[in-house]
Regions:
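Membrane-embedded segments
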Residues: 83-89, 111-116
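N- or domain-start disorder-to-order transition segments that initiate the globular core
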Residues: 44-72
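A substrate-binding/cap region within the structured catalytic cores of diverse enzymes
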Residues: 115-234
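N-terminal secretory signal peptides that target proteins for export/translocation
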Residues: 1-6, 10-29
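C-terminal regions of proteins
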Residues: 226-232, 247-311
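Short internal beta-strands
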Residues: 103-109, 269-272
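Short hydrophobic beta-strand that contains or immediately precedes a catalytic carboxylate
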Residues: 75-78, 240-243
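Bacterial N-terminal signal peptides
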Residues: 32-43
Length: 311
């Protein structure tokens, strides 16, 4: 190997052979370093722009992520809706997938809508009823363009807004027969239901009345059912879902419903999580939620709870 220096011509530098570390030794070393970090005896690297395995918290590489995605039947990519970095990374992952993905299902469009591949992206979104203001367009442009460049069909998968409001107001009587059957066949565990309730309460800045929580939970699950049905109906090779982190969670999101309807299918999901600059501690409760957690810096935004009130 040759090395160019500022003081002279190219010089020959000896090449050192580096052997890979034994996996068991690597795991022990990782656990010891983490223990030292938790005790404050070692500075843990900042989490932003890092990837970890959801079950173990061990570091993961982009190559490992892509390898798992390439072997999946259902690829579920989460997002924090207003974080541009999440959409950029997902676009990069989409471009790294092998050929064969024919369908990308979008939370951002109602079920039954689709993007016309013969039209420009802007025109196709307009005709499909995409709400530019609600989704902060063009935040999602990179990942939508990547999906189109793959030659995939982009299908809406979400519950219609009016249907969602009906579920919130009327409860189970607002579900159609297929929705009700799907949810009954895949009930949530007590733990998962508690996590979903906590997420809904946090998402409403702690102002969600307890009496409204059951129907809000049902509406969230009805949205998951709509997304899952669209994925299952589109299964002709690997299928991708682009949706919020809550929808792709393995404990209470779309994967629960896929497991009930396609038990032999391989589902790989990624949660994209924001961490403060310099944050070094691992968030708890990720083990059964995501296969991979991709940490990024937070988006710049005003406090969403400032002046919040329930409609």
């Amino acid at each position: 190997m040759l090395n160019q220096t500022s003081r002279g011509p190219l010089q020959t530098v000896p090449t050192l052979e580096v052997k890979p570390m034994n996996p068991r030794i690597r795991t022990r070393l990782f656990l010891r370093l983490r223990a030292l970090a938790l005790l404050g005896l070692l500075a843990w690297p900042a989490l932003a722009d890092t990837i970890v395995h959801g079950d173990s918290g061990h570091p993961a590489t982009r190559a490992e992520v892509l390898a798992d995605l390439a072997a999946a039947d259902f690829i579920l990519l989460g997002e924090t809706h207003d974080n541009p970095r999440h959409h950029q990374v997902r676009a990069e992952l989409m471009r790294g997938l092998p050929p064969g993905v024919k369908t990308v299902v979008l939370e951002h469009l109602e079920r039954g809508r689709r993007l016309d591949p013969a039209r420009s992206l802007d025109d196709a979104l307009e005709r499909a009823g995409f709400d530019r203001k609600a989704w902060g367009w063009p935040l999602h442009q990179p990942v939508f363009v990547a999906a189109r460049d793959m030659g995939a069909n982009l299908l809406g998968g979400n519950l219609g807004r009016k249907d969602g409001r009906r579920v919130v107001m009327e409860g189970e009587s607002a579900l159609d027969a297929d929705q009700a059957r799907l949810l009954q066949q895949s009930p949530l565990s007590t733990t998962a239901r508690g996590r979903l309730d906590e997420s809904l309460s946090t998402g409403h800045c702690g102002h969600l009345p307890a009496a409204r929580l059951p129907n809000m939970r049902l509406a969230q699950r009805a949205r998951d059912a709509a997304l899952a049905r669209t994925l299952l109906e589109s299964r002709d090779g690997p299928v991708v879902l682009l949706a919020g982190n809550g929808h792709v969670r393995r404990d209470y999101g779309v994967p629960v419903l896929l497991a009930g309807q396609a038990p032999g299918a391989r589902v790989v999901n990624i949660g994209f999580m924001e961490v403060a600059p310099g944050e070094r501690s691992e968030p708890a409760g990720m083990g059964d939620a995501y296969d991979f957690v991709w940490f990024t810096a937070p988006a710049q935004r005003e406090d969403p709870c400032a002046g919040f009130s329930m409609p």
